[in-house]
């Protein structure tokens, strides 16, 4: 643990506060030293939910399945900005090693899976897409009531105010209210937002909710269940699990067309993806149009269907088993 702390401090000193510290040879070598090879020998294969780069330093002698939501390459200047050339070279090199060493590569979106092929020359025949499921207990999956009239409860969920588009979300709801659509924005994931927005009468700050905490989990389920739509104008996104969770309850989704969102939000089926140039005017227009055309019920049903077909962990496990069988594992 001391070595990891020292490495983090050193890299921050060398490359600045924004430096990512988990994508270089020194970090992966430290991780490799913590592998218990006696336990590895008891396994039939190795499943990496990220972090398969340590395979560059450990000969596992087992088939590796590498599953994650992105590649290093597509995160540069997307999530990560201002990286030094050394950090980029390190990250690219060990991502390529991880993909090459993996017998099977699986990503949570077509966007990420395409990068495995296009940016790292991964094996097309053993490259798959498996979407993330919703992190809800089956017993709690009681569909939300589609919006008909009264106050429109809008859910915003995220811990990064800027990246998730918090300002656009607030201004969208503000505009809806000005148009006579009584709307309330429930903000989950943040305890504080800019003061000029926190005191607006239609904003409800629900705080950060840890789904591993039973009380927080119950509160989160109740919020989602009592919402009518998800508004998430996120300008950078790999595979937000809240998309799957919203579809599980039948909440129409309004977001940006970016990253891996295309596997989770299908225009006209369970919501709409707007171009990145869109602002609150366009989001308000899209929501208002869906309300006026009575499309919410269709989007509600479409979300539930999409969840049942592929955005749940039960289907994920069946598809994963099929992938394993196809590859004789």
Could you describe each region identified by the protein language model?
Residues 231, 243, 252-255, 265:
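Short hydrophobic beta-strand element within catalytic cores of glycosyltransferases
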Residues 96-126, 134:
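A short, active-site helix/loop in glycosyltransferases that binds the activated sugar's phosphate group
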Residues 194-229:
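Nucleotide-activated donor-binding/catalytic signature segment of Leloir-type glycosyltransferases, i.e.
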Residues 235:
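Aromatic "clamp/platform" in nucleotide-sugar-dependent glycosyltransferases that forms part
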Residues 295-310:
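A short, well-ordered alpha-helix in the C-terminal region of glycosyltransferases
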Residues 138-164, 169-175, 185-188:
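Conserved donor-binding/catalytic core segment of Leloir-type glycosyltransferases
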Residues 72, 84-105:
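Membrane-proximal helix-turn-helix segments that form the acceptor-binding/catalytic region
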């Amino acid at each position: 643990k001391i070595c990891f702390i020292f490495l983090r401090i050193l890299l921050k000193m060398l490359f600045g506060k924004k430096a990512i510290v988990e994508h270089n040879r020194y970090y992966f070598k430290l991780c490799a030293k913590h592998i218990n090879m006696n336990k590895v020998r008891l396994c039939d294969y190795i499943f990496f939910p990220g972090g398969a780069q340590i395979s560059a330093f450990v000969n596992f002698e087992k088939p590796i399945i590498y599953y994650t939501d992105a590649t290093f390459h597509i995160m540069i200047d997307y999530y990560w900005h201002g990286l030094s050339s050394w950090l980029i070279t390190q990250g690219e090199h060990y991502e390529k090693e991880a993909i090459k060493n993996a017998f099977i590569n699986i990503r949570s979106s077509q966007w990420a899976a395409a990068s495995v092929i296009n940016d790292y020359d991964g094996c097309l025949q053993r490259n798959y897409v498996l979407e993330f499921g919703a992190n809800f207990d089956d017993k709690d999956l009681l569909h939300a009531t589609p919006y008909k009239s009264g106050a429109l409860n809008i859910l915003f969920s995220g811990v990064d105010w800027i990246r998730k588009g918090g300002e656009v979300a607030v201004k969208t709801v503000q505009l809806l209210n000005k148009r006579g659509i009584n709307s309330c924005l429930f903000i989950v994931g943040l305890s504080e937002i800019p003061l000029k927005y926190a005191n607006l009468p239609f904003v409800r700050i629900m705080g950060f909710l840890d789904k591993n905490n039973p009380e927080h989990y119950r509160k989160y389920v109740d919020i989602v269940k009592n919402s009518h739509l998800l508004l998430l104008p996120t300008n950078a996104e790999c595979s937000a699990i809240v998309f799957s969770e919203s579809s599980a309850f039948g909440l129409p989704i309004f977001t940006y067309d970016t990253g891996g969102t295309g596997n989770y939000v299908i225009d006209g089926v369970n919501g709409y993806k707007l171009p990145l140039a869109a602002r609150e005017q366009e989001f308000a227009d899209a929501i208002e149009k869906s309300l006026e055309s009575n499309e919410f019920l269709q989007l509600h049903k479409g979300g539930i269907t999409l969840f049942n077909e592929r955005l749940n962990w039960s289907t994920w496990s069946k598809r994963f088993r099929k992938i394993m069988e196809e590859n004789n594992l």
